[in-house]
Swiss-Prot record:
Function: May play a role in DNA repair. It seems to be involved in an RecBC-independent recombinational process of DNA repair. It may act with RecF and RecO.
Keyword Signal included in the entry's annotation: no
Membrane-traversing stretches: none
Residues covered by the Toprim domain: 80-175
Protein name, as recorded: Recombination protein RecR
Lineage, broadest ranks: Bacteria, Bacillati, Bacillota, Bacilli, Bacillales
Similarity remark: Belongs to the RecR family.
Molecular function per GO: DNA binding; zinc ion binding
Gene3D superfamilies in alphabetical order: 3.30.60.80, 3.40.1360.10, 6.10.250.240, RecR Domain 1
Keywords from the named record: DNA damage, DNA recombination, DNA repair, Metal-binding, Zinc, Zinc-finger
Coiled-coil intervals: none
One of the GO biological process terms: DNA repair
Zinc fingers (C4-type) by residue: 57-72
CDD domains: TOPRIM_recR (cd01025)
Length: 198
């Protein structure tokens, strides 16, 4: 189908988002065309602002407006425990549960040889450096229960064991192949309470 150039560009831009195929991108593009100009300008500004105003915490890797992030700055947190997660949405899911009081480390991905992603491509080197310099007694590996998450957890466990830090994994109850961000608070709460040593 031939569209005017601005619509084609907008459709292609929407298709760069995860889970957005050609039909959904087309629907979003035409919806954008029907929006009031002020709303479109606000939407475009929000997209630009999220890239310009947010950064990653230099300590844990979580998205933040200020560096270090509010979690790393919170003196009430248990600094002896770090929960390692794959991405920022996992931190948000864990925080919703309101039971975990330790710190986080965001990997921004998982090891996936099929996709050409190795340990050096995600935030593992900074985790190891952090563990050597901080007073951490437990590392909770909260990767997603899928092949990539399990591979990443095993890799980190092998790296951390020689440092002498207790390494635990969330209890199962999270569905295999599922994503942490979609788990409800009760399931997450039980998984953190029943974590097992690796």
């Amino acid at each position: 189908m031939h569209y005017p150039e601005p619509i084609s560009k907008l459709i292609n831009s929407f298709m760069k988002l995860p889970g957005i195929g050609p039909k959904t991108a087309q629907r979003l593009a035409f919806h954008t065309l029907d929006m009031k100009e002020d709303d479109v300008v606000q939407f475009a500004k929000a997209l630009v602002d999220v890239k310009r105003e947010l950064t990653y915490c230099s300590v844990c890797g979580h998205i933040t407006e200020n560096d270090p992030c509010y979690i790393c700055e919170d003196k009430q947190r248990d600094r002896s425990v770090i929960c390692v997660v794959e991405d920022d949405k996992d931190v948000i899911a864990m925080e919703k549960m309101r039971e975990y009081k330790g710190l986080y480390h965001v990997l921004h991905g998982s090891i996936s040889p099929m996709d050409g992603i190795g340990p050096e491509d995600i935030n593992i080197p900074s985790l190891i450096e952090r563990l050597k310099n901080d007073e951490v007694s437990e590392l909770i590996l909260a990767m997603n229960p899928n092949l990539e998450g399990e591979s990443t957890a095993m890799y980190i466990s092998r790296l951390v064991k020689p440092i002498g830090i207790k390494v635990t994994r969330l209890a199962q109850g999270l569905s295999v192949g599922g994503d942490l961000e979609y788990a409800d608070e009760v399931t997450l709460s039980k998984a953190i309470a029943g974590r097992t040593e690796m």
